[in-house]
């Protein structure tokens, strides 16, 4: 006899199928926790364990650096899992490497060295030399003749001489990848997009490498695809910004802090050719993330019935969208050191305010409803 198929069953099957496309492999369902367990799940006495989801966004990753610095400064918070894409992947790998090497202070120092290295790379710094970091953040690169000329040429990376001398590679050689592969204390996932098949590949502690990080941050309009195992890879944000489900599979019932740097809203519709292109990329990078969270939201509706493979995940978001949505989109490509320091301070202040207001919720409840996080059109269709 065929049992009754309800809309809830269809929704759950749809969501799990969609998550499968994102690289999620179904784990045994997690029983419904008691109220006491729900309040203390994943938290040792006196400690609050969190997982982090770090978005990509070029120089905006310095905002995430500031958030991480504040979290590392809190002796009651343990970071036990990280998923990141592009700049978020770089932040995540440097963070976890530092934690494994010597704890929070080592991680803070490693992140500062990394971002100081980013600021020391060639860029448009001479144009901004008389500006504060905030002024630079509000200034479009389109006001720089050299940038405009480069954009006008509209060259493919394959039109230029081949070079393996990516300056980011030198910064990443400080990471001890062998140590990362051997440790299981902190789960780390990074995603990249296969340029040939359009499928997402998720790298974990055990197969992470410099090439995997460069692939995750490989903007196809700027760099040639990074080849790994004979396949070409582009920016992971095309298929997951970041990839959430693979991490939650390993950490059911966790507190997940999403550090969001890509603005959802912009005060005005773009008009220039470059701004139109940049905004379309920004929207597409957010879309896969929203869709994945939407599928998670459907599955998590079944947690009270003991049928969610993720347990009772508690969601939190740290962002400064009201400030960052007013920055020109080209500022993501600006590595001017005072701008990076400004974003760092903005991130640290954001983290400090969030902890003061919401820190007590860790291990107990969500501070962000997915319905509020997702755009209405996404939520209404799940």
Across the structure, where does each feature detected by a protein language model lie?
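Catalytic nucleophile loop
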Residues: 89
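Catalytic nucleophile serine of serine hydrolases
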Residues: 86
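Patatin-like phospholipase
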Residues: 2-83, 93-382
């Amino acid at each position: 006899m065929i049992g009754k198929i309800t809309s809830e069953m269809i929704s759950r099957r749809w969501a799990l199928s969609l998550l499968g496309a994102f690289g999620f492999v179904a784990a045994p369902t997690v029983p419904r926790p008691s109220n006491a367990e729900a309040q203390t799940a994943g938290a040792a006495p006196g400690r609050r364990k969190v997982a982090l989801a770090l978005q990509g966004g070029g120089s905006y990753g310095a905002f995430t650096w500031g958030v991480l610095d504040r979290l590392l400064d809190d002796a009651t918070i343990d970071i036990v899992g990280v998923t990141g894409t592009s700049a978020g992947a770089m932040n995540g790998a440097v963070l976890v490497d530092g934690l494994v090497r010597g704890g929070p202070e080592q991680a803070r120092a490693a992140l500062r060295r990394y971002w100081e290295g980013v600021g020391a790379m060639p860029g448009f710094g001479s144009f901004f030399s008389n500006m504060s970091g905030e002024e630079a953040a509000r200034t479009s690169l389109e006001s720089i003749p050299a940038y405009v000329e480069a954009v006008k040429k509209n060259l493919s990376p394959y039109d230029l001489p081949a070079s393996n001398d990516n300056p980011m590679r030198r910064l990443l050689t400080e990471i001890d990848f062998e140590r990362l592969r051997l440790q299981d204390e902190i789960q780390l996932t990074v995603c990249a997009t296969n340029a040939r098949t359009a499928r997402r590949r998720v790298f974990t502690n055990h197969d992470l490498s410099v090439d995997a990080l460069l692939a995750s941050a490989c903007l196809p309009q700027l760099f040639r695809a990074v080849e790994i195992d004979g396949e070409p890879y582009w920016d992971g944000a095309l298929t997951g910004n970041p990839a959430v489900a693979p991490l939650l599979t390993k950490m059911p019932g966790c507190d997940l802090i999403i550090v969001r740097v890509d603005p959802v809203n912009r005060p005005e519709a773009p008009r220039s050719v470059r701004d139109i292109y940049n905004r379309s990329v920004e929207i597409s990078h957010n879309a896969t993330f929203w869709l994945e969270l939407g599928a998670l939201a459907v599955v998590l509706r079944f947690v009270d019935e003991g049928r969610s493979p993720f347990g009772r995940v508690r969601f939190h978001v740290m962002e400064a969208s009201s400030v960052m949505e007013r920055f020109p989109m080209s500022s993501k490509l600006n590595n001017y050191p005072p701008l990076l320091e400004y974003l760092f301070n903005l991130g640290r202040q954001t983290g400090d305010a969030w902890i003061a207001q919401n820190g007590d919720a860790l291990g107990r409840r969500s501070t962000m409803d997915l319905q509020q996080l997702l755009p209405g059109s996404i939520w209404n269709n799940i």
